[in-house]
Amino acid sequence: MEGISHRTLLVNGVNIHVAEKGEGPVVLLLHGFPELWFSWRHQIVSLAARGYRAVAPDLRGFGDSDAPPSSSVYTAFHVVGDLVALIQSLGPDQVFVVGHDWGAYMAWWLCILRPDMVKALVNLSVAYAPRNPGRRPVDACKTIFGDDHYICRFQEHGAIEAEIAQIGTTLFMKKFLTYRKPAALIIPKDKGLEVSLETPVTLPSWLSEEDINYFASKFEKSGFTGGLNYYRCLNLNWELTAPWTEVQVDVPVKFIIGDLDLTYHTPGIQDYIHKGGFKSAVPFLEDVVVMEGVGHFINQERPHEVSDLIYDFIHKF
């Protein structure tokens, strides 16, 4: 695709596939679930044209990267370990980082654990959430949303994979990537994914059949367990990060979110983002952009605007 090159690097004991294009300062692009490097296809081309070296890995567990079988090796420490080794293999002492969804979560922790390696961060959709020492995150989801919240359902080893297999990878990708309800995603056990996620009559203009087929072809090979293991490590992350309770993120940050993103409608999140809590936890937060009429998969839905927002921030450094 438009001169994007691919290679596999052995980093931190796992083979990580990366897509890259361009020369100049490195911009590391980190995807979420259920996604791949391909989610950044538009930003890779745009950033390369503007004088940057855009590098988008398949995170461990996804796509053409290794997917270790144990669910306990998908913690923030394992994934950040991959990212540190990847950055070191790319050469520069510091990189720009852009994250979305789980990629944003891991980018926050990269900045906490190795702020020396990050020039500046642009994160999409997932705001930094300081550790709550009084409640494990999955327990919090159950309390707020009930046992059928998608994060709770994703904890069940094998069960959600079986539901995905029942409807098929291609249909699951269509349903998940086009989910646009500004509310919590609930997957009742008695109804499952088939009913809980609507099937689009037609794909939106930003997502083609070819795009869906690319995603589906990779997940057909890799399966979904690697990606789901990120959710299954949420409570383990909480346990392991106890020494970092009340830590701040001390790198320059820009945050972008869509007003139809389900994460923007988590109870209390808008007050946190806009009324000082976020800025307190991320003191070098320079800008928050709320894009109107945009759902969760913001970098694909509004590729040119997101690319411009990224460039407008990082070119200052």
Please state what every model-predicted region is.
Residues 1-7, 316-317:
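Basic/polar N-terminal segments that are highly enriched at the extreme N-terminus
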Residues 14-67:
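Conserved HGGG/HGGXW glycine-rich cap/lid loop of the alpha/beta-hydrolase fold
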Residues 29, 56-57, 99, 123, ...:
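Conserved SAM-binding loop
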Residues 33, 37-40, 102, 108, ...:
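Signature tryptophan residues that serve as conserved aromatic anchors
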Residues 283-317:
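Catalytic active-site module of serine/aspartate enzymes centered on a nucleophile-bearing elbow/loop
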